[in-house]
């Protein structure tokens, strides 16, 4: 790959580092060399060769306020000056405690106990451990399996992979290695899932689902009735319900949290990605008092034995508090509503193309699903040549822009997709 680096090879750090870096989701022998970035601002990525790209996916769905927002930057700088990090075992700091209180007040339902970690995958691992140990602490060891759903993706660590779709996901190499759980269809009605829970409910600790939008598994949508059915089935069969809002949380679907649209709340929720406005890594797993009370005991073996080294990192918590400030002060959800309209209008021409299976929009998520994409790397390069950064997955081209994107920038993104898909049809 290094001999393909082109202009970037003139930079010593790039040419030398390329011999040692292992990139994500990439076959290193064939993947095009990564683009060297020297600066970000707003929705723009500036490359080392001087080109500027409009980011259509907000750095994997994180930079909801755009890059380099001054309020977040100032909060992080102020925290850096006093305390960048201190371990969270036996010690406490203001940023984490304030953030926990704010999240508890913001979340729907009775989600009030906040456990911090450092990535979305780990937040899911914590949720799975909470759910399993909840039953163990109640003296029930047989409820140790999960119901997850086809098309779902929950992360790349072992437990998270095990509750992701083994066929449509990215972890087929681990078939037969990971723990086996129940992978079901999202219920259009109660019958199939009802039958599964009738037969196996006494072994199921929890169901886990991405509310309204399954992200990395293909950007598939489902409706609020599905979430209501899951809540009702969880209650009927005495299993817990986990909502993975790592992608959908913080306004992406048009409400602060996707589950608000269904009027139901889970027993456990996971958050990350836009939690810090895309500035720093941070995640949280939040549980109801029902869950927390199962761990509240004089018995030390009933404690939740988990502790990421950088959990509740002070810089990440400062960024998250600043991001929540912006949601309170700025019209972010109104901006998402405007983006919804622009995406529907801008992507509509794709519906007329014979190679397009579906065009769908939810909040600040716009999706063009194709019959197939033969060469993802070539397609990504075509977008870069048009001055936009769009990263298709599977057979899907999608947009998840910053909520602060201008109408002209968003039109540039949708025009690039329409032009490219039209060209693919020929």
Q: Where does each model-flagged region fall?
A:
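Conserved N-terminal phosphate-binding loop of PLP-dependent enzymes in the Aspartate aminotransferase
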Residues: 2-426
């Amino acid at each position: 790959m290094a001999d393909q680096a082109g202009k970037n090879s003139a930079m010593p750090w790039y040419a030398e580092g390329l011999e040692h870096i292992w990139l994500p989701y990439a076959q290193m022998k064939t993947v095009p060399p990564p683009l060297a970035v020297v600066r970000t601002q707003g929705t723009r990525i500036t490359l080392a060769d001087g080109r500027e790209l409009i980011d259509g996916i907000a750095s994997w769905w994180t930079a909801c306020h755009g890059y380099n927002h001054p309020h977040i930057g100032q909060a992080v700088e102020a925290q850096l000056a006093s305390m960048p990090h201190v371990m969270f075992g036996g010690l406490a700091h203001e940023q984490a405690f304030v953030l926990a209180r704010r999240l508890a007040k913001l979340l729907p339902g009775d989600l009030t106990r906040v456990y911090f970690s450092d990535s979305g995958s780990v937040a899911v691992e914590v949720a799975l451990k909470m759910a399993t140990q909840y039953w163990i602490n109640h003296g029930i060891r047989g409820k140790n399996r999960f119901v997850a759903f086809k098309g779902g993706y929950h992360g790349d660590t072992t437990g998270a992979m095990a509750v992701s779709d083994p066929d449509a996901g990215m972890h087929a190499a681990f078939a037969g290695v990971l723990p086996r759980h129940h992978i079901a269809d999202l219920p259009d009605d109660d019958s199939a899932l009802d039958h599964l829970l009738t037969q196996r409910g006494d072994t199921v600790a929890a169901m886990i689902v991405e509310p309204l939008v399954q992200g990395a598994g293909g950007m598939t949508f489902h409706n609020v009735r599905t979430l209501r059915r899951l809540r009702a089935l969880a209650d009927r069969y005495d299993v817990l319900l986990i909502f993975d809002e790592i992608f959908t949380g913080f306004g992406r679907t048009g409400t602060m949290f996707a589950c608000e649209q269904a009027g139901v709340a889970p027993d456990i929720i996971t958050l990350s990605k836009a939690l810090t406005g895309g500035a720093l890594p941070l995640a949280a797993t939040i549980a109801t008092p029902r869950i927390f009370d199962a761990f509240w005991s004089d018995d030390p073996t009933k404690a939740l034995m988990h502790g990421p080294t950088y959990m509740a990192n002070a810089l990440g918590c400062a960024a998250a508090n600043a991001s929540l400030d912006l949601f309170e002060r700025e019209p972010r959800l109104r901006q998402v509503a405007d983006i919804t309209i622009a995406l529907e209008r801008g992507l509509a021409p794709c519906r007329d193309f014979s190679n397009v299976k579906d065009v769908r929009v939810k909040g600040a998520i716009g999706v063009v699903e194709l019959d197939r994409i033969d060469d993802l790397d070539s397609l990504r390069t075509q977008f870069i040549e048009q001055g936009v950064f769009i990263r298709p997955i599977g057979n899907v081209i999608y947009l998840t822009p910053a909520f602060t994107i201008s109408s002209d920038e968003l039109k540039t993104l949708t025009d690039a997709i329409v032009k490219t898909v039209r060209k693919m049809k020929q």
